[in-house]
From Swiss-Prot:
Compositional bias (Polar residues): 1-15, 28-40
Residue positions binding Mg(2+): T88
Chain sites annotated for binding ATP: L42, R43, G84, K87, T88, T89, E150, D151, F152, R193, Y203, R240
GO molecular function, one term: four-way junction DNA binding
Organism name: Synechocystis sp. (strain ATCC 27184 / PCC 6803 / Kazusa)
Name this protein carries in UniProt: Holliday junction branch migration complex subunit RuvB
Subcellular localization: Cytoplasm
Cross-referenced InterPro entries: AAA+_ATPase, AAA_lid_4, DNA_helicase_Holl-junc_RuvB, P-loop_NTPase, RuvB-like_N, RuvB_C, WH-like_DNA-bd_sf, WH_DNA-bd_sf
Length: 361
């Protein structure tokens, strides 16, 4: 059931403020329209077509049906978890299910209050505003969101000093969907204003296999179920990586003039791209090797590892560490990062004894 739109934000023509004059900055197209359309086609459009995240889907299904029954907007939703697990896709699915628009932006793009103000005033009843990397919102922008989320009201300060006045503008009832890889970095006032807070987990191999088979069908790629499974096993539990690896294996099969992707061909291709059987790439192995060879397995601080590898500390923490922690190759303690026995064995090295001193009896 679609939500009725009023399309009126009750703005007075006499209100003049920088906050009400958002600049429209044209963005360069980084990819061709055909490529963008293809990428969009890989995303499922409805909740029933979304593979994986079973518990989360049930929570969202109930929220959608309840909101439709009351003809209301869905409560504000915070999605958190490692990158590439489908947070943006879920926001688009919510909009499709609710038959409303979805406006997509990222916190770093909302540098000035006028940026978020323009977005909020343009929203119609039921619309979804998706903010990626929401933990990176600056203080002023975040404070503007508080009354917007809670009371659907925008408070704007007119003038300066003692003559300053606060004018409140009514907003359409909308849904804010925030996405973050660092939920602990959100302030309590912002986090507490989300009615739904849901975590996305890494995907199982069989779920990634289904995603790869679906993507292969869309891209007209011939692949066997076992070939899809071989790619899924190296996809780090992440759909975005699974689709990327499929495209690289597709290129390899095309050049090698192979009509179908099977496990042997997939392994050959991914070995060429230095993606091993657990999905670790060159940088993953570099982090583990550096920790083991230069720091005797740890414990070692993140900055020290970053300096030794030449990688950005934030990149290591947000891109590489989550999967290494998930598969048990890395441990984080109050003293720093530690390579586990499994990491030594994966790299073909003999772990020291005892590897983890705190486990000694």
């Amino acid at each position: 059931m679609a939500i009725k739109r009023s399309g009126n934000n009750n703005l007075s023509p006499n209100v003049k403020s920088d906050l009400l004059s958002p600049e429209v900055i044209p963005q360069e197209r980084s990819t061709s329209p055909e490529l963008e359309q293809q990428e969009a086609s890989l995303r499922p459009q409805r909740l029933a077509d979304y593979i994986g995240q079973r518990d989360l889907k049930e929570v969202l299904r109930i929220a959608i049906q309840a909101a439709q029954g009351r003809q209301e907007a869905i409560d504000h939703l915070l999605l958190y978890g490692p990158p590439g697990l489908g947070k943006t896709t879920l926001a688009l699915i919510l909009a499709e299910e609710m038959q409303v628009r979805c406006k997509i932006t990222a916190a770093p793009a909302l540098e000035r209050p006028r940026d978020i103000t323009g977005l909020l005033l343009a929203l119609q009843p039921g619309d979804i505003l998706f903010i990626d990397e929401i933990h990176r919102l600056n203080r002023l922008t975040e404070e503007l969101l508080y009354p917007a989320m809670e009371d659907f009201r925008l408070d704007i300060t007119m003038g300066k000093g003692q003559s300053a006045k606060v004018r409140s503008l009514k907003l359409a009832h909308f849904t804010l969907v925030g996405a973050t890889t660092k939920v602990g970095s959100l302030t309590s006032p912002l986090r507490d204003r989300f009615g739904l807070i849901q975590r996305l987990r890494f995907y199982e191999v069989d779920e990634l296999q289904q995603i790869i088979l679906r993507t292969a069908g869309i891209l007209s790629v011939s692949i066997s179920p076992t070939g899809a499974e071989a790619i899924a096993m190296r996809a780090r539990g992440t759909p975005r990586i699974a689709n990327r690896l499929l495209k690289r294996v597709r290129d390899y099969a095309q050049v090698k003039q192979q009509p179908e992707i099977d496990p042997a061909l997939a392994s050959e291709a991914l070995d060429l791209y230095q993606v091993d059987k657990r999905g670790l790439d060159w940088t993953d192995r570099l982090v583990l090797q550096t920790l083991i060879e230069q720091f005797q397995g740890g414990p070692t601080g993140l900055e020290a590892i970053a300096a030794a590898t030449g990688e950005d500390a934030k990149t290591i923490e947000e891109v590489y560490e989550p999967y290494l922690l998930q598969i048990g190759y890395l441990a984080r303690t109050s003293r720093g990062r530690i390579a586990t026995t499994a990491a030594y064995e994966h790299l073909g090295l003999t772990p020291p004894t005892p590897l983890l001193p705190w486990k000694e009896s």
